[in-house]
Amino acid sequence: QKTSRTTKKGNAMKLNEIREEEDKSSTPLILLDSPKNEPKPRLIGLFGNLDEEKTEEIVHSLFILDGLDHEEILEDPQDLTSAVKETIYKPIDFHISTWGGCARGMFAIYDAMRALQQRTDIITYGLGKVMSAGVLLLAAGTKGKRKIGKNCRIMLHSVRADQWGPIHNLENEMEETKLLQEQHINALVAETHMTKAHLKKLLDRKV
């Protein structure tokens, strides 16, 4: 018995045409994008070591997200040509799981976060491990919106340097390292309830 065509008169259809109709009516099992009526995630992450490339990526992502998906409140909601009374910026989620890395890169991201927090919240999440340069970034989240996983480990140590060259270069680098250390402590004091004396005591443990 042949099955390549239907047998009813006037309603003959090839099987490949039937399959085509079935394909058109089928529903995809995997959604590659959020439904249009759901908010898009405003998410960035720092995973692994913080180097120059990741610093650039995170800073650019912060400013790009800041310029997207905000809501303008008009003085007269019924008049679309009226002046903007207020702009509401939606929060940014920052997931952190890092061994640490470059201190200067840390400060670049930190300064970007501080600039954006003048108008939007940045919610930080510590996951797995937050060490070295990652500690300040976790602490730099909007106060009251800094979160940490139950099994996340935190590690803080003094600024480290790897220097070589003529003695005057080494002296200059040492002064720069001391300055970075002082900046790091001052930033942590500003973002936490820890005092400078307590932080210096922690850093003197030579982790």
Q: Which residues does each PLM region occupy?
A:
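Terminal-region recognition feature
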Residues: 5-207
